[in-house]
Amino acid sequence: MRPDQIQPEMYEKQLQDKQAELAKLMATLSLPEMEVFASQPTHYRMRAEFRIWHDGDDLYYAMFDSADPRTPIRTDQFLAASRLINELMPKLLDAVRDVPVLRYKLFQVDFLTTTTGEALISLLYHKPIDAEWNAAVQQLNNAFPACHFIGRSRKKKQIITRDFVMETLTVNGQKFHYQQVENSFTQPNAGISEKMLEWALDVTKEASGDLLEMYCGNGNFSIPLARRFDRVVATEISKVSVNSAQLNIAINGMHNVQVVKMASEDVSAALNGDVELPKSLVQAGVSELTPSVVLVDPPRAGLDDATVELIRKIDSILYISCNPETLKANLEALSNTHEVVRYAMFDQFPYTHHVETGVFLRRKAS
């Protein structure tokens, strides 16, 4: 993304263009009216990554145009990023510029912030980081007491205080707390994330019984939805995300959610009866689980055939998609057994062609 792509005066038009593109792609499917959830036009991203460009005595943040990836675009401020990131950007450079051990071979800075004012700053180097660097970054941390710092160089990660922030999302007036770990997946647009959670709660308001969730991440959906169901069993392949999910379940006081570390393909094979149930699923009580709803939030590749066959067996499907093309293919595969009753577009990534889509399906009457 180029910084000049952020044009607040064009926000509504780009939103309408996205809506039209999504409607065109999905035109061959039988869908209800699209619900559209707009983002804030500026300061919506809670995380951002910048290259660091060294030009003589000068030092500045840089972004690049994919059409010209060799030419840096000086980025002193970034309207897409949170206000806290924009506040920290010049202060950090001023603090690093005259400290050789912090400046030398620094090539990237990553910011992760929260709605509650926390910040985690990762400094990435093309050199080893050593005791001298550690002493200097400790002094830097003293100058930024509300921030946490991480140093990264080849095969090394140095944590100063901690490598995560605690985010709070407000959903229908209720606050939910989430650990978000550096370099792990979280939705970048907190405002849209809150709207997605509210929508998920709304479409499942008549649900009962149990929930099966696949690709649960850090428990983003699992935790608010837990109050809708008797039991929730959620699966996730990333060890870091599983650990965060378990912590988040505890700090939010949820006692009916269990998270299992397992790839979706293995979950599908086990629950479809193709292989024996692994011990982790047995311990989670999957044999006694009676899901009325399954929630899937797959990567851009969408759902594999075995997972489609698994979720086909469940009466209601809540599908969160980051790729409308693979979503369309999966919906076509499910069309013989299920119909879409709710359909929403979430502008998680303004000024880009990317969208998040949510659909809620119910089994067709026999």
Curated annotation (Swiss-Prot):
UniProt catalytic activity: uridine(54) in tRNA + S-adenosyl-L-methionine = 5-methyluridine(54) in tRNA + S-adenosyl-L-homocysteine + H(+); uridine(341) in tmRNA + S-adenosyl-L-methionine = 5-methyluridine(341) in tmRNA + S-adenosyl-L-homocysteine + H(+)
Residues at which S-adenosyl-L-methionine binds: 187, 215, 220, 236, 297
GO molecular function: rRNA binding; tRNA (uracil(54)-C5)-methyltransferase activity, S-adenosyl methionine-dependent; tRNA binding
E.C. numbers: 2.1.1.-, 2.1.1.35
List of catalytic residues: 322, 356
Any GO CC annotation of this UniProt entry: cytosol
Keyword Transferase: yes
Family to which the UniProt record says this protein belongs: Belongs to the class I-like SAM-binding methyltransferase superfamily. RNA M5U methyltransferase family. TrmA subfamily.
Protein name, UniProt field: tRNA/tmRNA (uracil-C(5))-methyltransferase
Provenance organism: Marinomonas sp. (strain MWYL1)
Classification of source organism: Bacteria, Pseudomonadati, Pseudomonadota, Gammaproteobacteria, Oceanospirillales
Gene that this polypeptide is encoded by: trmA
